[in-house]
Amino acid sequence: MPQLDTSTWFITIVSMLLSLFILMQLKFIKFSSFSTPCPTTMEKTKHLTPWEMKWTKTYLPHSLPLP
């Protein structure tokens, strides 16, 4: 029974890793990133909702005072 020839495995694995590294670098180079991130000021928008105009309280039946 012949043995498996593993003499070329090292160069195959190294070349595969190198090519994957190069491909990933080429993929990442397409992404644009900001060089200096600056904060943006967000303006608050006021939404008019009916429950903000008056104070309401919800009474549950079990919280009513006893007679």
Curated annotation (Swiss-Prot):
The keyword Mitochondrion applies. The keyword Transport applies. One of its GO terms (molecular function) is proton transmembrane transporter activity. The modification N6-acetyllysine is found at K54, K57. The chain crosses the membrane at residues 8-24. It is a single-pass membrane protein. This is ATP synthase F(0) complex subunit 8. It comes from Dasypus novemcinctus (Nine-banded armadillo).
